[in-house]
């Protein structure tokens, strides 16, 4: 369950940012997660609640913004949506795609006191 590890890393980032900005409490965390990242959002939410107990992020809202997958076809050069790895180009049917979006995993913003 790598969601638990991800939440530990998120809390480390929160602590770093909060310490540098002299924050007392984190009220909301906004994550950007690419559609192609293998993250179970329910497990991530559960892990976040567990990991943040006793920290400045305890009871913080976790908001997840999903970034759709997108690729450029190496054959026809069209930008196409990508729902999973090894999708084919919706324009020409080629499987040679270069991923441009969908693998993001970052803390986008925090609301703090």
Curated annotation (Swiss-Prot):
UniProt keyword annotation of Zinc present: yes
Gene3D superfamilies listed in its UniProt record: 3.30.2320.80
GO terms under biological process: protein maturation; protein modification process
Listed PROSITE patterns: HYPA
UniProt KW Transferase keyword: no
One Pfam family recorded for the sequence: HypA
InterPro entries registered for this protein in UniProt: Hydgase_Ni_incorp_HypA/HybF_CS (IPR020538), HypA/HybF (IPR000688)
Entry superkingdom: Bacteria
Chain positions recorded as Zn(2+) binding sites: 73, 76, 89, 92
Annotated residues for binding of Ni(2+): 2
GO terms assigned for molecular function: nickel cation binding; zinc ion binding
Keywords: Metal-binding, Nickel, Zinc
NCBIfam families: hypA
HAMAP family: HypA_HybF
Family: Belongs to the HypA/HybF family.
PANTHER family from the UniProt entry: HYDROGENASE MATURATION FACTOR HYPA
Purpose: Involved in the maturation of [NiFe] hydrogenases. Required for nickel insertion into the metal center of the hydrogenase.
Record protein name field: Hydrogenase maturation factor HypA
Source organism (scientific name): Legionella pneumophila subsp. pneumophila (strain Philadelphia 1 / ATCC 33152 / DSM 7513)
Gene behind this protein: hypA
């Amino acid at each position: 369950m790598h969601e638990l590890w991800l939440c530990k890393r998120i809390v480390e980032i929160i602590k770093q940012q909060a310490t540098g900005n002299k924050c007392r409490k984190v009220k909301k965390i906004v994550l950007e997660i690419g559609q192609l990242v293998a993250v179970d959002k329910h497990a991530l939410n559960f892990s976040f609640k567990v990991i943040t107990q006793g920290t400045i992020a305890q009871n913080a809202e976790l908001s997840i913004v999903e970034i759709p997958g997108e690729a450029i076809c190496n054959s026809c050069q069209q930008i196409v949506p990508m729902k999973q790895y090894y999708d084919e180009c919706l324009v020409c049917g080629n499987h040679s795609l270069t991923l441009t979006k969908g693998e993001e995993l970052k803390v986008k913003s925090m609301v703090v006191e």
